[in-house]
Amino acid sequence: LWGTDEYIHKGYKASDEISISVLAGFLGDIIQPRILKSSRLQQERTRKKGEVFTPSWICNKQNNIVDEAWFGKENVFNIELGKEWKTKTNIILFPTKKSRTWKKYIDSKRLEIACGEAPYLVSRYESVTGEPIVFIDRIGLLDRKIRIVNENTTDVDTWYTWIIRAYQSIYGYDVQGDNVIIARMNLLLTFIEAMEYRWQRKPTVQEVKKIARIISWNIWQMDAFTLSIPEQKYEVVKCYMNLFSSENETVSATTIPCKIMDWRRDRSIPVESLKEIYWKGRHAMKFDVIIGNPPYQEETAKKETKNGQKAVKNIFQYFQMEADKICKGSIVLIYPGGRWIHQSGKGLKKFGLEQINDPHLKEIIFYPNATEVFTEPGISDGISIVYKNMNKNSKQGGGIIHLFRTWNRADFSCTISRGEFIAVKSK
């Protein structure tokens, strides 16, 4: 489904299905990566939903936080150099723990929320400029798994077996159909490029189809607030019986819940079940990693105010709260910082206090000036990268933040626990 009204001028409503004929028009400029869309449309997405380009260096920084936690050391895949990085070319060495082998790394389940074109999963191009990134320098979570498979297999059959498992462990969802299509294409093209890079041949049709089927399950369309297919409902007819006949029929509309695949157990499961501890007699599936740059806000009014603006509400906090429920490992999200740190904004006081006192909270990286990260204007209260570790063995008393970094020393701030916020200026 389109899942957006952006294509109404082309004759496609949000509830319309994206047909094969439309997909054939991908090259005809019907569906485009965000970098190729008009500046007006980009600004509209930013204004309505707080949707912004996530530069590749930020994706790399967040992905590095995840891998630092997994490996127990820094700079495993690359070294960050400001807004660039230098790829490490030596063979990746794994810890001696049985739970930290290269095969365990491949099977680690990793989800990008509100994935857009999936820049955290695969980095075929710089999302801000559209410039291609050479294969060996890519920084996505799937890119990293492919590198590990390349370094630990010696024949194409074993390689393909573990590439399949790598794809089965990478997930992403988005509400907009055009984003889902582009994300799927990026993952599929990454497989083709990986085969060419490692084995100097193109994959067979059957090899491509098998990967494509996995992608069609693992990159899916979903409304994050209902965990259901956007714009779709089915009718439920309720019939009340009296002594002689049925009467009082009523019809209600119910959303269609989304399902995903648990490949290791070879079964589909409702997304809702991820929130449970147990499901159908077994431990419910949880993600080992959740990462992303969720939407920050949504418009709540159709009419503009006198100053030409529309009322909006914060929504980024809901993505953090839901991620906390379905992850058993690392969560690294980026969203506006000042409004929750200083409890400004409806519904953010409770969220801010709970967040800052969460014993799973490990690190905050704060940029007071959002333009240090994003080129789009409109985020006035700074940007925070928030890292939590939901592993039950990682809890620490007090929920004290280990790092609170700013690129503007004159506006340095830090927070401490105990249910209140304290700003420390120029320390």
Task: Tell me what each language-model feature is.
Residues 375-427:
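Long, internal scaffold/assembly segments composed of regular secondary structure
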Residues 1-365, 369-373, 385, 389-402:
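SAM-dependent methyltransferase catalytic region
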